[in-house]
Amino acid sequence: MDGAPVAEFRPTMTHGGRYLLYDIFGNKFEVTNKYQPPIMPIGRGAYGIVCSVMNFETREMVAIKKIANAFNNDMDAKRTLREIKLLRHLDHENIIGIRDVIPPPIPQAFNDVYIATELMDTDLHHIIRSNQELSEEHCQYFLYQILRGLKYIHSANVIHRDLKPSNLLLNANCDLKICDFGLARPSSESDMMTEYVVTRWYRAPELLLNSTDYSAAIDVWSVGCIFMELINRQPLFPGRDHMHQMRLITEVIGTPTDDELGFIRNEDARKYMRHLPQYPRRTFASMFPRVQPAALDLIERMLTFNPLQRITVEEALDHPYLERLHDIADEPICLEPFSFDFEQKALNEDQMKQLIFNEAIEMNPNIRY
């Protein structure tokens, strides 16, 4: 896909020249006419396709994600709206910036949603899988930026819930930006996520135990897993299923004591944990002898079984391992908590369309119909 000749994708003008329609390998890709060729497909997922293209008004290259048939499934539509609203609210160097929600040519008659964000070069998943050399300084700098972005997210009263290497985007200067907020939740909410959940390998023990009152600490666990994967170039806990995942965790950090199980209110979950084989705690120093002790100390504090005892993002930024990079004056917080109120109402397809259309119009006040 990456090597496709640029000349292949010539647009057709539509809607009186206000829009350009590209055919990307049989996929219809229709955007406002400020997005001029050359256009390049750079990725695809279950939702649709992503292309890089230049906005000729701002002279900035952007990544445009097409979410095809965005309203076929209520949950997916809500996820799209949540992502748009969150990205518009969160303004931070380590969070991907939203540039546009492209207004549809005909206000009520649209099924696809196009979201433009900053264009990045790659993601952490690709870097980990590549044979590119990564010094410990690189890993440390990536960890610092993840925590810096997460401090801002958590201060907005938001839990990301789906941190994993492929959701951490990078450019050639090693700048890191967190993306994919479709699963984010308010940090005060206590009902168990009913839909998708964090990719299993990065999932905190309390989520594996179906704890209903999880907190921002679940993101910290994910960061610990990601950092060790960066250093080791392979996943720390690559579980095949829920039970295998928990076994891998306890084999490393030890079977939790009754004291460590204190946060679990569900008696069945406690019983389940008590019946697991008894594993002693292994020291990270014995498993990763080449990693400096300060790094391992921080990771052990992140990978603490009990979320109430797990280190917070602010505490992690203040840890001696990050002393070289830490600067509290340059680690901003979000001054206004994000409101998830729009999720409280049951919305039908037309209402959901209207809300996403409203977001597009707010970002394109000069559009005329």
UniProtKB/Swiss-Prot annotation:
Segment forming the signal sequence: none
Subunit structure of this chain's protein: Interacts with MKK1. Interacts with CPK18.
Catalyses which reaction(s): L-seryl-[protein] + ATP = O-phospho-L-seryl-[protein] + ADP + H(+); L-threonyl-[protein] + ATP = O-phospho-L-threonyl-[protein] + ADP + H(+)
Residues the record lists as Phosphothreonine modifications: 14, 32, 194
Protein name: Mitogen-activated protein kinase 5
Active site: 162 (proton acceptor)
Disulfides per UniProt: none
Free-text note on domains in this protein's UniProt record: The TXY motif contains the threonine and tyrosine residues whose phosphorylation activates the MAP kinases.
Entry similarity comment: Belongs to the protein kinase superfamily. CMGC Ser/Thr protein kinase family. MAP kinase subfamily.
Pfam family, one: Pkinase
Keywords in alphabetical order: ATP-binding, Cytoplasm, Kinase, Nucleotide-binding, Nucleus, Phosphoprotein, Plant defense, Serine/threonine-protein kinase, Transferase
Up-regulation conditions: By benzothiadiazole (BTH), dichloroisonicotinic acid, probenazole, jasmonic acid, wounding and infection with P.syringae and M.grisea, by stresses, hormones, heavy metals, high/low temperature, UV-C and phosphatase inhibitors.
Binding site for ATP: 42-50, 65
Gene designation per UniProt: MPK5
A GO BP entry: defense response to bacterium
Enzyme class, broadest EC rank: transferase
Entry's EC annotation: 2.7.11.24
GO cellular component terms, semicolon-separated: cytoplasm; nucleus
Compartments in which it is found: Nucleus; Cytoplasm
Record SUPFAM superfamilies: Protein kinase-like (PK-like)
Alphabetized GO MF terms: ATP binding; MAP kinase activity; protein serine kinase activity; protein serine/threonine kinase activity
Activity regulation, free text: Activated by threonine and tyrosine phosphorylation. Activated in response to low temperature (12 degrees Celsius) treatment. Activated by phosphorylation at Thr-14 and Thr-32 by CPK18.
Tissue spec. comment: Expressed in roots, stems and panicles, and at lower levels in leaves.
Gene3D superfamilies, sorted: Phosphorylase Kinase, domain 1 (3.30.200.20), Transferase(Phosphotransferase) domain 1 (1.10.510.10)
